[in-house]
């Protein structure tokens, strides 16, 4: 589902928000590069207007309270523009609808830029269709390793991973998993963590070019 946002109705509450609305800042990359904290969801909506959301998991959570048993819904949501930006978030509420909205907001605040490239040695297409190099992420007992794949392979990963990859704009990937991968939450978080690790690997401009990674 694509989310709607009305720029005209937005009244920024922060200096960063005002710079975005005034058109001084026109790219989310500018904010990421400067390391500015994003305090308004509207900043994400304005700079990434084509974000889509997907519910990854809905779970009923019970806990004991002095007034009795409390029941909440815990929802995991992924958002992305299918072109290099993806986020993962969690929301809790007594009803599913509010829990989803909280999870969407949390996912927006967790948006990252995903490094993509043509990292498989057998593929020289030069498109940013896969991960540029092997990378791993973990959450709890789950460890997910993403491996570059040539064009046409598709997403060789579990359904939860497929959703996150698709929203990130990755078309082809091999994967290897360990741990309790049937635990949806940890599988999603480990996959997202692997994508985050892509940006933490230091590489020269020459190496990035060889891997088909766009430096802009």
From Swiss-Prot:
Keywords: Ribonucleoprotein, Ribosomal protein, RNA-binding, rRNA-binding. InterPro entries: Ribosomal_Su5_D2-typ_SF (IPR020568), Ribosomal_uS5 (IPR000851), Ribosomal_uS5_arc (IPR047866), Ribosomal_uS5_C (IPR005324), Ribosomal_uS5_euk/arc (IPR005711), Ribosomal_uS5_N (IPR013810), Ribosomal_uS5_N_CS (IPR018192), Ribsml_uS5_D2-typ_fold_subgr (IPR014721). GO terms for biological process: translation. GO terms for cellular component: cytosolic small ribosomal subunit. It comes from the Archaea. Residues 51-114 form the S5 DRBM domain. One of its GO terms (molecular function) is structural constituent of ribosome. PANTHER family: 40S RIBOSOMAL PROTEIN S2, RIBOSOMAL S SUBUNIT. Belongs to the universal ribosomal protein uS5 family. With S4 and S12 plays an important role in translational accuracy. The N-terminal domain interacts with the head of the 30S subunit; the C-terminal domain interacts with the body and contacts protein S4. The interaction surface between S4 and S5 is involved in control of translational fidelity. Part of the 30S ribosomal subunit. Contacts protein S4. This is Small ribosomal subunit protein uS5. It comes from Methanothermobacter thermautotrophicus (strain ATCC 29096 / DSM 1053 / JCM 10044 / NBRC 100330 / Delta H) (Methanobacterium thermoautotrophicum). The lineage of its organism: Archaea, Methanobacteriati, Methanobacteriota, Methanomada group, Methanobacteria.
